């Protein structure tokens, strides 16, 4: 029944609406509004790269693209496939699209066993982590794009209005609160980056987090159940010190911060005071563009927004990139007239790690 629930059917004339790139194939009915040839070629290369990194043989893998009328895109992974919905008239930029799709590819291999709050940080965090670091290592992603994605993730993590939630609390809100939903992803990503740095330091660069991940993939494919305690044991066998305090600090409570060399010595880190994006309305407004949960005397209320209004605002990653003193411009239509309401980012702030390329390094 689980396999049946994960099965996706696409019906229609697909004879001319697909491309194959090695074991990976891409299928669509409505033209998706992107260059499918270059998209499929890059995704096929990424599939081969991940298959090799995780020590798992390549096998047929299908990507289904479908149209929807909404902003942005969403995707879900299934056995040997994933489905992505996008708006052909408003497609994502190439970088955001590739990052989303590379994330979904990782789900084909990397899993832990256990309850949701014990494994989601690994499943989603490893997908965020490897969708960035593997293309960077392979030269498929330049340092500027890599750092832009990492620094947005850091802001989503450490300036998140829900940052005080434990991972168990965040998991309970996983499908109802957009901001809480992001915490397992980004905390897991920065934990794995920090762990990779600790492994490299303690083993004179001989062991990476990749080596532990390959062991998990191998042993789970042989039928072994590996949960959070099994993961910690594998780390401890290499580092010879308790791992749970690190996991608690960076994932369970989120109180800790990754080390400066989490992504390698070619980057340096600084702590930056950035805005906490809490505008005084329900977080779903950032996704739907429909104002809900307006807080009396909150920033949006003071700026003149009304509950249940439809608004147009930048995509959330663009909002997260904003700095203290910037102004968020929101377009709203009232009675056939269009107006712009501005919310200055002068509220709460948080110190967040941000990375940049280190000058004069040979690493």
Kindly give the residue locations of the regions a language model identified.
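Soluble non-cytosolic domains of exported or imported proteins
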Residues: 33-45, 91-96, 100, 117-121, ...
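Beta/coil-rich, acidic/histidine-enriched accessory regions frequently appended to metallopeptidases
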Residues: 219-363
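Acidic/His/Gly-enriched intrinsically disordered linker/tail segments
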Residues: 116-189, 202
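Pan-zinc metallopeptidase signature
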Residues: 165-253
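Propeptide (latency) domains of metzincin metalloproteases
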Residues: 1-17
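Juxtacatalytic substrate-recognition/specificity segment
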Residues: 15-119
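Long, well-ordered core segments of solenoidal/helical folds
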Residues: 105-106, 110, 150-162, 212-222, ...
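Surface-exposed patches in mature extracellular/periplasmic domains of secreted proteins
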Residues: 56-64, 115-119, 138-147, 205-212, ...
């Amino acid at each position: 029944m689980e396999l049946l629930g994960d099965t996706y059917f696409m019906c229609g004339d697909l004879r001319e609406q697909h491309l194959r790139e090695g074991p990976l194939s891409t299928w669509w009915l409505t033209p998706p509004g992107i260059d499918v040839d270059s998209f499929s070629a890059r995704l096929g290369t990424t599939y081969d790269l991940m298959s090799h990194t995780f020590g798992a043989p390549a096998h047929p893998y299908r990507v289904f693209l479908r149209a929807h009328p909404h902003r942005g895109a969403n995707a879900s992974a299934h056995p040997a496939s994933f489905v992505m919905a996008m708006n052909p008239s408003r497609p994502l930029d190439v970088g955001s699209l590739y990052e989303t799709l590379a994330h979904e590819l990782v789900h084909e291999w990397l899993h832990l066993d256990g309850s949701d709050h014990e494994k989601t940080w690994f499943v989603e965090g490893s997908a965020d982590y490897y969708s960035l670091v593997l293309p960077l290592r392979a030269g498929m992603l330049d340092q500027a794009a890599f750092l832009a994605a990492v620094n947005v993730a850091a802001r989503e993590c450490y300036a998140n209005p829900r940052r005080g939630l434990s991972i168990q609390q965040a998991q309970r809100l996983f499908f109802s609160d957009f901001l809480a939903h992001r915490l397992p992803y980004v905390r897991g990503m920065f934990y794995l980056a920090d762990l990779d740095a600790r492994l490299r330091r303690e083993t004179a660069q001989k062991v990476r987090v990749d080596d532990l991940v390959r062991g998990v993939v191998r042993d789970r494919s042989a039928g072994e159940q590996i949960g959070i305690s099994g993961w910690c044991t594998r780390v401890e066998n290499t580092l010879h010190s308790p791992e749970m305090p690190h996991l608690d600090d960076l994932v369970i409570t989120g109180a800790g911060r990754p080390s400066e060399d989490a992504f390698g010595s070619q980057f340096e880190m600084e702590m930056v005071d950035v805005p906490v994006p809490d505008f005084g309305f329900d977080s779903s407004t950032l996704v739907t563009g429909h104002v809900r949960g307006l807080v009396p005397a909150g920033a949006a209320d003071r700026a003149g927004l009304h509950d249940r209004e439809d608004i147009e605002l930048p995509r959330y990653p663009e909002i997260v990139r904003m700095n203290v003193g910037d102004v968020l411009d929101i377009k709203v239509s009232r009675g056939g007239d269009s107006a712009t309401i501005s919310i200055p980012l002068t509220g709460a702030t948080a110190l967040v790690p941000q990375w940049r390329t280190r000058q004069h390094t040979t690493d």
